[in-house]
Amino acid sequence: TTLFKEEDIHFWNKKEFGKGYQNDLAAVVAPVPLQIASPNKAATFVPLAENKTYQPGDPVSTIGYPTDSSSPELKKPIVAGQLYKADGVVKSVDNYDDKGSKGITYHMTSVSGLSGAGIINGDGKVVGVHQHGTIENGIPDKDRFGGGIVLSPEQVKWVKDIIAKYGVKGWYQGDNGKRYYFTPEGEMFRNKTAVIGENQYSFDEN
């Protein structure tokens, strides 16, 4: 179990956190790289998209760890603690402010525990954060919906700045003294060779 400290949580607008979905945004810096903490060290990251306009009908997905749901109408069963991906399409788009922050709703499986999951566009990039939607059991999957925030240009920069400041790059020592190498993009090298500086290294599956 990994415990977060208060200083690991970075609020977009802590003072007005509860005033509107446009302020319901925070980033958490993990105490250890998630690739190392994940099962089989297999975690990967989805790239961050630049701000753009979305239209009804555009494909979107969410990926997260929802709590168990007993609703028999869901397309795929939800198993507590296992990654769950839901696919859907944009239903509507609303402007939150004049800085490019938008709210979108989408036809999609939405259950309790998905809040905080990334909203992923058709290009496979994170555009925002899932915030709300259908959580009741017994509602057919076709009638379930979700909604969240599409990051404004300013919010995209804010996230990038956090990654640049806290993201692991280069050699990381942990996990009983083992050393791991992370590229500037956040990839952890496994099962490959790479030239770093003037030396060639070989990385095993660990």
Predicted regions and their residues:
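A structural micro-motif recognizing beta-strand termini
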Residues: V28-Q35, A49-N51, H107-S110
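Extracellular adhesion/carbohydrate-binding repeat motifs centered on closely spaced tryptophans
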Residues: V168-N206
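Acidic glycine-/aspartate-rich tracts in secreted/extracellular proteins
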Residues: P31-Q35, P66-D68, K125, H132-E136
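Terminal peptide-recognition signature
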Residues: V28, G57, T62, Y106, ...
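C-terminal subregion of chymotrypsin/trypsin-like serine protease catalytic domains
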Residues: D98-S101, V111, S115-G167
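Short glycine/Trp-rich loop-beta-loop segment that forms part of the substrate-binding cleft
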Residues: P33, P47-G81
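Conserved catalytic-core segment of clan PA serine endopeptidases
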Residues: T1-K41, D94-D98
